[in-house]
């Protein structure tokens, strides 16, 4: 800014301060000792409003590394953040992207039932657990 515009700006602030204080004093009882403080406060408030308003930049939605449809395949699941393929995404998301599965789903607008494990891998794990007898009640001993 040039000195001329600074002077004009400062003069405008003084005029506005005078008008506001005059209007306030005409409708309110203000002790004479508090007038300098009132004038300084109004001038300071007006001076702080001369700063330009911050420009709000719209946040662009991130582009996934692959399409959501192609990210889930039978034998692998692809990370939308980096494009890597995995059998299980949960650990990768936490260690490389610092995201929980819920945060990942929210970030990419995925449904709550979006898998974090490749379907074939989940099926193999399920089959193995059933063969081992996990999830079944144990027989009671000696009664």
From Swiss-Prot:
One GO biological process term: regulation of DNA-templated transcription
Record's keyword annotation contains Glycosyltransferase: no
InterPro entries to which the protein is assigned, alphabetical: ROS/MUCR_sf (IPR041920), ROS_MUCR (IPR008807)
Signal peptide (from-to): none
Stretches of the chain forming a coiled coil according to its record: none
ZnF C2H3-type span: 79-97
UniProtKB keywords: Activator, DNA-binding, Metal-binding, Repressor, Transcription, Transcription regulation, Zinc, Zinc-finger
GO molecular function term, any single one: DNA binding
Keyword Zinc annotated: yes
Family statement drawn from the similarity comment of this UniProt entry: Belongs to the ros/MucR family.
General function of this protein: Regulator of exopolysaccharide synthesis. Represses the activation of EPS II (exp) genes for galactoglucan and activates the EPS I (exo) genes for succinoglycan. Also negatively regulates its own transcription.
Name used for this protein in its record: Transcriptional regulatory protein MucR
Gene: mucR
